[in-house]
């Protein structure tokens, strides 16, 4: 039986207007949940960031090749669906970037 590749959309703690898609290593397929933090490489240098999982799906990005998630930081979500919905409202109402809301909502100790 072949396993499907899982991709996740994450909010990076940077002032960027978009979510970014990462490929989940097969060994983490059963552990991933929306609202968990994942360690992901970003940029040409591959600097590691603590990003928040917003969506889980099976569709690879079309504009770039998805990098692999390095690891998961949490066993359980640290942000629930209701909070993420509120963050979406803040992004829309204040025309803010998701990363800015992420930075404002979570304490610095929860970031890399």
Regions found by a protein language model. Name each.
Residues 1-112:
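Accessory, non-ATPase domains that flank or precede helicase/AAA+ motor cores in DNA-metabolism machines
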């Amino acid at each position: 039986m072949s396993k499907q590749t899982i991709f996740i959309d994450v909010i990076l703690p940077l002032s960027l207007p978009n979510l970014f898609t990462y490929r989940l290593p097969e060994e983490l397929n059963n552990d991933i949940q929306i609202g968990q933090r994942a360690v992901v490489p970003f940029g040409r240098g591959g600097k590691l960031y603590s990003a928040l999982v917003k969506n889980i799906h099976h569709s690879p990005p079309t504009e770039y090749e998805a990098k692999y998630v390095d690891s998961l930081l949490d066993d359980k979500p640290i942000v629930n669906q209701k909070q993420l919905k509120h963050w979406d409202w803040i992004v829309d109402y204040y025309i803010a970037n998701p990363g800015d809301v992420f930075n404002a909502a979570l304490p610095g100790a929860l970031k890399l």
